[in-house]
Curated annotation (Swiss-Prot):
Species annotation: Buchnera aphidicola subsp. Acyrthosiphon pisum (strain APS)
Lineage: Bacteria, Pseudomonadati, Pseudomonadota, Gammaproteobacteria, Enterobacterales
Residues covered by the PABS domain: 5-238
Binding positions (spermidine): 64, 88, 158-161
Chain's role: Catalyzes the irreversible transfer of a propylamine group from the amino donor S-adenosylmethioninamine (decarboxy-AdoMet) to putrescine (1,4-diaminobutane) to yield spermidine.
Pathway stated in the Swiss-Prot or TrEMBL entry: Amine and polyamine biosynthesis; spermidine biosynthesis; spermidine from putrescine: step 1/1
Name of the protein in question: Polyamine aminopropyltransferase
Highest taxon of source: Bacteria
Assembly, per entry: Homodimer or homotetramer.
């Protein structure tokens, strides 16, 4: 065992993961979160918020690509996007790659997270905060979605886990307001954790989303940082045709973007909606 200091994640009571700290870069409390940033030889820089790993340099692309490109490519003509959370800038970076998108609104509760990630994780945002299409708002996501008059083609909820101020972004009230601020054929997506270890959170999301969307599903990705199996993303829309897109149609849309990806591709897009049977069983029983 290396004699360097180790840090143990405190997401679960009876099991977890640890990281060797090569170098501590930052450790302070903001008005909203306890934040720690350190270097690790495997994952590079790691950001921890409230004792839970949020993002790493090494594998952030998987999470950010899947939460962004699956709904954008499925829809085909996104013009306006609302990002709730996402202070590390990764979702914003991916959204900004699309020239067809005209307006981007981002609502982040903690400006300190944005500033820290600009400093320690500059490749996450990759200058996206300078994009002229961006309207950056520092506010609680639920507060914003309740009072805004705008509607969006796509709403992406890139939140922390449902603890502390992140709880607001997992409530039925939040999903209701998101649905009301989507255009007629809009899509809502959100991170929903690792199903094998966070089953109850996913089932609660499923029950709440079903109240407001005709098509409520989850899709999946394997993100090494998020311990415990496949990670699931919530999907809500009133247009059931999006998930019926053929492989050929998805391939054409991706080709037309002229974008390169590190994880996402047409076959990943289609297959991500095919969930393991143990997840389907639990969702069907709920």
């Amino acid at each position: 065992m290396d004699h360097k200091k180790t840090w143990h994640e405190k997401l679960y009571c009876h099991l977890g993961q640890y990281f060797l700290i090569e170098k501590m870069l930052y450790k302070k409390k903001t008005p909203h979160h306890q934040v720690m940033i350190f270097k690790n030889s495997v994952f590079g820089k790691i950001m921890v918020i409230d004792d839970i790993v949020q993002t790493t340099e090494r594998d952030e692309f998987i999470y950010h690509e899947m939460l962004t490109h699956v709904p954008i490519i499925a829809h085909g003509s996104i013009k306006s996007v609302l990002i709730i959370g996402g202070g590390d800038g990764g979702i914003l970076r991916e959204v900004c790659r699309y020239k067809m998108i005209e307006n981007i609104t981002m609502v982040e509760i903690d400006v300190n997270i944005i500033d820290l990630c600009k400093k320690y994780f500059p490749n996450h945002s990759n200058q996206a905060y300078q994009d002229s299409r961006l309207n950056l708002i520092i506010d609680d996501g639920l507060n914003f979605i309740k009072r805004t008059k705008e509607k969006f083609d796509l709403i992406i909820s890139d939140s922390t886990d449902p603890i502390g101020c992140g709880k607001n972004l997992f409530r039925s009230e939040f999903y209701f307001n998101c649905k009301n601020h989507l255009e007629e054929n809009g899509i809502f997506v959100a991170q929903n954790g690792v199903f094998f270890l966070q089953k109850n959170e996913t089932i609660l999301t499923y029950k709440n989303l079903k109240k407001y969307f005709y098509d409520t599903r989850f899709y999946q990705a394997n993100v090494p940082t998020y311990y415990g199996g496949v990670m699931v993303f919530a999907w809500g829309t009133n247009n059931i045709e999006y998930r019926k897109n053929s492989l050929e149609k998805i391939q054409i849309r991706i080709k037309n973007t002229k974008l390169d990806f590190n994880y996402y591709n047409a076959k990943i897009h289609i297959s991500s909606f095919y969930l393991p049977q143990y997840i389907l069983n639990e969702l069907n029983e709920s």
